[in-house]
């Protein structure tokens, strides 16, 4: 597959908010804090889910996948952004830009599918509790996770090849923090409408189908929870599912804004802020939401922290 055409520059210039110098330091601080929290939070979740036998369940298997994904998601872009801001170095090589684009798209699409799988897990747990162990068996969970990752990377290859093969006529100034589809399409010197239509189709498949399945799942969950007579049971069900719904709303809301409208209609600065939110801030919030709002996770932290830091059995 040819990732480079005759009009491809050797490097790109990432403009970011370079026209607003006063934003550079606050942005650097926000990115550094967010990235630190994301690393600490997601690594902690992964360790607890792996080390605590009580969390060896489908729900926490998928949560471990989500933590790995969020860790990779932010690491793909944030370190380079911090270097660009801190060293006032705005360039990225063509190969680096291609890597950014492929990995960022792949992880984003994988998260879309993984969140849908997690909502199905909650649906089975709440609405089909007697069949939960049979339906959500080890091999089914493994296949669903593998399916999410494979489809995510397959979608990335398709969208990246369509975007990168557009003629750019030497244009190399990317008005963004990193290489993303809407920003790269604006560099093209040809009519992008046919490509935008194809990208829109893939985005509908990856975004709207999973979010529709999630809404259907939570419709059934809400009906089942309202039938629970125990107030404690309702609270536990809403608590577990509420964390997932917050994550879904934050991620899908911002991703749909960016990818289900033509790049030309996206406000330049607003598009950058939305990308920062769903690409970086959401990953940080995921770890906080799942660790602080989840009773099982908090109890597991309390059990494991003494063993980790004081080597007590």
UniProtKB/Swiss-Prot annotation:
Membrane-side (Extracellular) residue stretches: 1-25, 80-100, 159-195, 260-272
GO cellular component: plasma membrane
Cytoplasmic side: 50-57, 121-139, 220-236, 293-313
Cellular localisation: Cell membrane
Keyword Transmembrane helix: yes
UniProt entry keywords in alphabetical sequence: Cell membrane, Disulfide bond, G-protein coupled receptor, Glycoprotein, Membrane, Olfaction, Receptor, Sensory transduction, Transducer, Transmembrane, Transmembrane helix
This protein's name: Putative olfactory receptor 2B3
Gene: OR2B3
